Regions:
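A structure-centric feature marking long, well-folded core domains of fungal metabolic enzymes
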Residues: 36, 67, 101, 117, ...
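NAD(P)H dinucleotide-binding glycine-rich loop of Rossmann-like/cofactor-binding domains
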Residues: 11, 20, 44-105
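Structured loop/turn residues at beta-strand edges in well-structured enzyme cores
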Residues: 37, 62, 96, 140, ...
Length: 181
């Protein structure tokens, strides 16, 4: 017996194809697309539509960007994810010039974007990362960098106007922020 859900079609798959972040090559474009052509190397994030893990997918022009030629597909696929998450939380935190902020996990995809965006906003940045990434995080714009393998960021006695945990391992980051005092 065949069970029809709708008169004019079949039921959607119960497990849609996953993925909101992609990097690849444009195979074809619609007649109204202005920014891309066949063969363009691109990367994208689409928080409203899954399907990035499919071999082919169709996404709106507004969520796609051209991939720089000196960047791999793997690197490009991480650009928008880290940047979007960092931007969202810094915007939500209403970061202002001269504020003192802490970025825990400053060397990952979200953290590196957060350091650069916070620098753009004019904030004073303390980054927390491992020994291997201290100079890298400093080069992104952090004024102070704490090596979490040697020092606990919460023990410094410093208060921050905003703290971003880009790792997700802190049980309680409220003790870092004036917003919670």
């Amino acid at each position: 017996m065949i069970k029809f859900i709708r008169t004019l079609g079949f039921k959607k798959p119960s497990n849609p194809i996953l993925g909101m972040v992609l990097a690849g090559e444009v195979d074809s474009v619609g007649k109204d697309v202005k920014s891309f052509k066949n063969g363009d190397q691109v990367y994208a994030i689409n928080i409203r539509q899954f399907g990035a893990y499919a071999e082919y997918t169709c996404w709106p022009e507004s969520v796609i960007a051209k991939k720089p030629s000196d960047v791999s597909y793997e690197e490009a696929s991480s650009f928008r994810y880290g940047g979007l998450i960092a931007w969202y939380y810094l915007k939500k935190g209403n970061i202002q010039s001269e504020q003192n902020i802490l970025i825990y996990g400053a060397s990952g995809a979200v953290g590196t974007s957060a350091v650069q965006l916070a620098r753009y906003y004019g904030a004073k940045i303390t980054g927390v990362c491992s020994t291997a990434n201290l100079e890298f995080v400093r080069s992104l714009g952090a004024e102070l960098v704490i090596d979490y393998t040697k020092e606990e960021a919460t023990k410094s006695g410093e208060y921050y106007d905003f703290a971003l945990d880009a790792v997700g391992k802190r049980k309680n980051s409220n003790n870092w922020s004036r917003q919670d005092k």
